[in-house]
């Protein structure tokens, strides 16, 4: 495995963790809160953003305008069944989600959720590192590379791993600050 390829894999894990963080609710309205929601539409699970326009007219409201008015009921149901804790208001044309301020208890829960997501990202990075180190050891065993080259590669792999986990820690700190800021 080439170092550039390895760096790319680790970067993708960091980006996936960032996207996961975006789905965690803070006190402000954000359309990415609805990224994980899928709706049963003509027998298939379809992402909500494929079925409607999602906007945030102000800091405490999300407005969902379905492309097909026949799907408004199923969209409303999918939001109600999600773990977001939001109650949809359907006026027949659009669905409004009012984002209530978070309680201190809910903020603590969300910080824990963010911590779990960060840990999942770090595990993914460690798995990438493990696979890369195994590959280097295999090449060394087959005499494709020298012992010194293997050691240098393993050090480079570790540097990339440290950079990626540090980036996830930075993202986590920023998300925790965002969640706990009233």
Curated annotation (Swiss-Prot):
Family listed: Belongs to the RRF family.
InterPro entries: Ribosome_recyc_fac, Ribosome_recyc_fac_dom, RRF_sf
Protein's cellular compartments: Cytoplasm
Any one Pfam family match given in the protein's UniProt record, by short name: RRF
GO cellular component: cytoplasm
Main location group: cytoplasm
PANTHER family: MITOCHONDRIAL RIBOSOME RECYCLING FACTOR PSEUDO 1, RIBOSOME RECYCLING FACTOR
Keyword tags: Cytoplasm, Protein biosynthesis
Gene3D superfamilies: 3.30.1360.40, Ribosome-recycling factor
NCBIfam families: frr
Protein name, UniProt field: Ribosome-recycling factor
Claim: Protein biosynthesis is one of the keywords in the record: yes
Single GO molecular function: ribosomal large subunit binding
Function: Responsible for the release of ribosomes from messenger RNA at the termination of protein biosynthesis. May increase the efficiency of translation by recycling ribosomes from one round of translation to another.
Species this protein is from: Synechocystis sp. (strain ATCC 27184 / PCC 6803 / Kazusa)
Gene Ontology biological process: translation; translational termination
Highest taxon listed in the record's lineage: Bacteria
